[in-house]
Amino acid sequence: MASGKDTCPTLPKLTNNCSDESLYKSANKYEEIHLPRFSLKQGMIPRRYVMPWKENMIFRNVNLKQAEVCGIHTGPLEDSLFLNHSERLCHGEDRKVVFQKGPPEIKIADMPLHSPLSRYQSTVISHGFRRRLV
């Protein structure tokens, strides 16, 4: 029979050769990868447009400091705001903030299709007006 004490074999101690910083860097190495996002292609958007302050070499340092304070990306590889008729969405102002700056659009939900005050009694005009509001 076994004695009253349970004996467990002693396991060798492992040495910790990795520091906390190297563990943090290896865990976050995939967060540094950046994939640009673009909007859908539209004919009104230019083929390529670079913001003038990025090309102004006289006041370049001042412009870069101001952009850094505002939180605007100033990297060398993604200098164009528009590329191939698409807008770059990854390094811009948040869409919700942009929409809050403008005046709210008034939507008329109860507009009659034919108004007696209308000069043109066309369903095409009234449907087109409704389509713009939606």
Swiss-Prot record:
Major subcellular location class: cytoplasm
UniProt KW Signal keyword: no
Cystines in this chain: none
Entry's localization field: Cytoplasm, Cytoskeleton, Flagellum axoneme
Single GO biological process annotation from the record: flagellated sperm motility
Keywords recorded for this protein, A-Z: Cell projection, Cilium, Cytoplasm, Cytoskeleton, Flagellum
A GO CC annotation given for this chain: sperm flagellum
InterPro entries xrefs: SPMIP10
Stated role: Microtubule inner protein (MIP) part of the dynein-decorated doublet microtubules (DMTs) in flagellum axoneme, which is required for flagellum beating. May serve to reinforce and thus stabilize the microtubule structure in the sperm flagella. Involved in the regulation of sperm motility.
Subunit structure and binding partners: Microtubule inner protein component of sperm flagellar doublet microtubules.
Name of this protein: Sperm-associated microtubule inner protein 10
Classification lineage: Eukaryota, Metazoa, Chordata, Craniata, Vertebrata
Gene that specifies this protein: SPMIP10
